Design a protein with these regions (language model features):
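Generic low-complexity, intrinsically disordered sequence content enriched
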Residues: 12, 18, 40-42, 63, ...
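Ser/Thr/Pro/Gly-rich low-complexity linker/stalk segments immediately outside membranes or between
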Residues: 37-47
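N-terminal secretory signal peptides
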Residues: 1-8
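N-terminal export leaders
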Residues: 8-38, 199
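Protruding loop/beta-arch "assembly-hinge" segments enriched in small, turn-prone residues
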Residues: 274-300
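Acidic/polar surface patches and capping/hinge elements
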Residues: 48-278
Length: 300
């Protein structure tokens, strides 16, 4: 593969994963020839650290936007994400239940998935290539090789850090990659992430690809991974596909959104109670007042 071809392929991958749009939105890169910071004549090495500083919060926003689209796929509501996918409700849904907060917190802090199992996916996302058959949005085609390479290097450093890789980011990039495979038009439109731009039916197709550990998806993630890591990658994706749906549903129907951790009380009626018609816990329980007629044993 020629250098030019590699640049086109890497540009396509970063765009499909949602990274380039997030970087542009955060000001980490400017898609013009004279745009800062690239007009100042700084070297690529001098640009990496400030780009990383801008890219980190941009990637967090990318992850949150993607998770918003995922949770509304599971429990739609009256929010913009649900309406955009074509399946919504007049009642509150996962967004109002703060399910994205629950899911991101669970993925990044509590999911019992050791970092060594997440690492193959993170490594794959850091080195993946993709074909350039999917047309990119106009502003992203104006990126210079220096801009592309700088963002690319910043992403690799973030994913290759010795710190624990946020699982929510790894999942978000994977969902966005599959989203553009299902519908290339998801590269364009509202929201930050391609996955959130999909219709409800297309989101279902994307989840099906992940749950089925589609060979094309594994190939797109990293053609350079050795076979043992390919097997690990497939296993992680298969686990993630099912867990995302389950965690989203659990979070939406739990008391998470109105639970006060300090007082350990509910501050309001949980969204899940309203959706399911649950009337709430009983105000009290019958107290034990002794044995009937003083009996303490039974003789047969």
């Amino acid at each position: 593969m020629t250098t030019h071809r590699k640049q086109l392929s890497r540009r396509a991958f970063l765009a499909r994963a949602g990274v380039l749009s997030a970087a542009v939105a955060a000001g980490a890169i400017v898609p013009t020839v004279t745009g800062l910071p690239f007009a100042s004549g700084e070297t690529k090495a001098g640009l990496i650290d400030p780009v990383i500083a801008l890219l980190r919060p941009a990637l967090q926003e990318l992850a949150r936007d993607t998770i918003n689209g995922l949770t509304t796929f599971v429990v739609p509501g009256s929010d913009p994400y649900s309406k955009a996918q074509g399946v919504s409700s007049q009642a509150a849904g996962s967004i109002q239940a703060k399910t994205p907060d629950f899911l991101m917190g669970a993925l990044d802090n509590f999911v019992p998935l050791p970092n060594e199992y997440v690492r193959p996916v993170a490594a794959a996302l850091a080195t993946a290539v993709s074909d350039d058959k999917i047309p990119l949005p106009g502003d992203l085609t104006k990126l210079l090789p220096l801009q592309l390479n700088t963002v690319d290097e910043a992403l690799k450093r973030i994913l290759a850090t010795d710190e624990t890789v946020p699982l929510s980011l790894v999942i978000a990039m994977t969902l966005n990659l599959v989203a553009t495979q299902v519908n290339p038009a998801s590269l364009h439109g509202a929201f930050v992430s391609p996955f959130s731009r999909l219709s409800w039916a297309d989101k279902g197709k994307a989840m099906s690809l992940i749950e089925g550990t589609d060979s094309d998806l594994v190939q797109a993630l990293d053609v350079n991974l050795p076979q043992p890591l390919h097997q690990s990658l497939s296993g992680v994706l298969k686990f993630v596909g099912g867990a995302l749906i389950e965690f989203s549903a659990f979070g939406a129907f739990s008391e998470y959104g109105v639970f006060n951790k300090q007082t350990k009380t509910l501050t309001g009626k949980p969204v899940g109670w309203t959706i399911s018609g649950y009337g709430g816990i009983a105000e009290g329980w019958d107290d034990f007042k002794g044995y009937y007629q003083g009996r303490k044993k039974v003789e047969g």
